[in-house]
Amino acid sequence: MVFDLGGISHFTGQNQYPVTWSVTESALLLNTCYHPTEWDIYWRLEPCDFVMRKLEREERLFSTPAITEAWAHAVMRHPLAYLQHRAAFTWNFLSGNNLTMWVADVERPTETVFSDRPAFVALVSLHDMLKPSPLFRAGTWLVLCIVVCGFAWPRRETTEGAFALGVCGSAAIYVLTFSAVGVASDFRYAYWAVLAGIVGGAVTALGRLKPQLS
C-alpha cells in the first residue's frame, strides 16, 4: 500500500499519504522518488527513505488502519492514476532489465562476492552476457506458459496435458497477480514460471510426439 500511495501521489501530483511533508520532501515525493520498480525506494533507499521513517518511526502509522484507509481513499478518488501506476509496474516487471543475480558483497558494497573463485567469476560473466536477452525477462516465461496452456488444453484429459495445464496455468496466474499486488521487480519472482514453462513445455511436446512414436 505504501508503494501504491507513492505511485498515485506521483501520477496525481498530490500527496496521498495520511501525513504532511516538508516542501523539500513533497518535491522529492511527487517528482523524484517514484520509479515503477520496487517499494524499497520508500523504505530504505536514500534520499526517499524519509517516507517510511515518518510513517513507521515518527507517526507510527505503518500497519495501522490509517494506511489502509488512505490507500482505499486514494484508489477510489484516483482510479486512473492507480491504474497508471500498476501498469507501469507491470510493464517493468515483465520487460524491464531487473535484478537477476546478487553479486554485491554486503560488508563491502563496492566489491563482488567470491571474486577469488574462478567458477563463480565465469558464472557471473555468463550471466552478464545473457542478461540483456529475453531469457532474463519475466514476460518471456509468462508468454511461454500461456502458449503451453494453449497447446495443453485440447489434451487436458490426458496425464501430460493435465500436468502441463496445471503447472503452466498456475505459473501464469501467479505472475499475473503481480499486476495487482507486486511491490518489487526482481527476476526471482518469475522463477516458478521459468520452471513451469520448461517442464510443462517439455511434457507437452513429448505428449504430442507419443502417438507418432508408438
Can you describe what each PLM-predicted range is?
Residues 82-167:
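Membrane-interface anchor segments at the N-terminal boundary of transmembrane helices
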Residues 139-144, 190-200:
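Membrane-embedded alpha-helical segments of multi-pass membrane proteins
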Residues 153-160, 201-214:
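Membrane-interface junctions at the ends of membrane-embedded or membrane-associated helices
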Residues 169-180:
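Aromatic-anchored segments of alpha-helical transmembrane domains
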Residues 179-193:
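Membrane-interface catalytic loops of GT-C/OST-like multi-pass glycosylation enzymes that act
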Residues 147-151, 173, 197:
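Catalytic cores of PAPS-dependent sulfotransferases
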Residues 45, 49, 170, 190:
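Membrane-embedded glycan transfer/ligation machinery
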Residues 1-113:
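Membrane-proximal stem/loop segments at transmembrane-domain junctions that anchor or position
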